[in-house]
Amino acid sequence: MLAVRKARRKLRMGTICSPNPSGTKTSSEVCNADWMASLPPHLHNLPLSNLAIPGSHDSFSYWVDEKSPVGPDQTQAIKRLARISLVKKLMKKWSVTQNLTFREQLEAGIRYFDLRVSSKPGDADQEIYFIHGLFGIKVWDGLMEIDSFLTQHPQEIIFLDFNHFYAMDETHHKCLVLRIQEAFGNKLCPACSVESLTLRTLWEKNCQVLIFYHCPFYKQYPFLWPGKKIPAPWANTTSVRKLILFLETTLSERASRGSFHVSQAILTPRVKTIARGLVGGLKNTLVHSNRWNSHGPSLLSQERS
C-alpha cells in the first residue's frame, strides 16, 4: 500500500516461506519474510522512495476487545448505542479490518503499518492501546512482536505510521515514545533526507525501523519522522471505479522528492453501507462483493496488495 515512484512496479512475491528439503532456497523460491534481503543488488542503492512497498490498513485491528469501552475515536451517539446488548458485537464486525497478526503480516511481506492509538479510560498504568472503534492489544505487545521478527530478519525494513492519537496528553506521548525506544533501540532510523535512504545504507547502520509520528511531539526526538514525510490521501468511497481514479490522480500529483507516498487502496463503508450490512459486517458486505477481477487483488483492507 506504500506505493513510491511507480505503483505499477509490482514486487514479485513468492510463497510466504517454503524452503526446499535441503534447507536452502532455489532461485525460483522467494520467501516473503525476507523479500527485501532477496532483492537484486542493483536495487540495494536505489532510494526506498523508489520502491513499491506492500502495506496494510488499520494494521493492528485483527483483534479488538468487545468487552472494552467504546473508543474515544467514536461519537457520543455510538457510545450511547453501545450500552445496548449486542451492539459491541456488531461493532466488532466492522472494526476488524485484518485477519493476520503483526507477525503473520510481516511473514507475508507487509512492511508498512497504519497505526492508531489511544489511552484507555480508567487504566492506571498509562498504557497505550491500538484503537479502531474498540480497543485492541497494547501497543507494547505489538511492538515486541514486530521487534522479534526484525531480530530474526535483519535485512527487512519497516515503516510504522502513527497517524491517529486519541485521549493522549504529553505524559501519554512520552510513555509511547519510551516504549518505542525500549522495543527497537538501535534499530530506529533517525529522520534524514528521504532520498538518502537506501537498503544498503540502512543495512550498514543496522537500522530497520522508520517511525512516522503525526503530532508536533516528533520534534523532541531525532528518530521520529514528521507525518508530512508520508502523506496518505484517502478516497473515502465505496466505489471501485472512483477509488482507482483517485489512486491514479493522487499518485501522479504527489511530490517527486522529499517524502514517501501512501496509496490507500481501500474502500470505506458509509453509514448506509453499514446499515444495510449491519449483521454481516465488513468482510461479507464489502470485501466479498468487491474484487478487481479473477487476476487482481482485492482493494479492501481485509487483504493486502
Curated annotation (Swiss-Prot):
It is found in: Nucleus. Keywords: Hydrolase, Lipid degradation, Lipid metabolism, Nucleus, Transducer. One of its GO terms (cellular component) is nucleus. Widely expressed. CDD domains: PI-PLCXD1c. Disulfide bonds: none annotated. It catalyses: a 1,2-diacyl-sn-glycero-3-phospho-(1D-myo-inositol) + H2O = 1D-myo-inositol 1-phosphate + a 1,2-diacyl-sn-glycerol + H(+). Catalyzes the hydrolysis of inositol from phosphatidylinositol (1,2-diacyl-sn-glycero-3-phospho-(1D-myo-inositol), PI). Could also hydrolyze various multi-phosphorylated derivatives of PI, such as phosphatidylinositol-4,5 bisphosphate (PIP2), releasing inositol-1,4,5-trisphosphate (IP3) and the protein kinase C activator diacylglycerol (DAG), therefore mediating cell signaling. This is PI-PLC X domain-containing protein 2. It comes from Homo sapiens (Human). The lineage of its organism: Eukaryota, Metazoa, Chordata, Craniata, Vertebrata. The gene is PLCXD2.
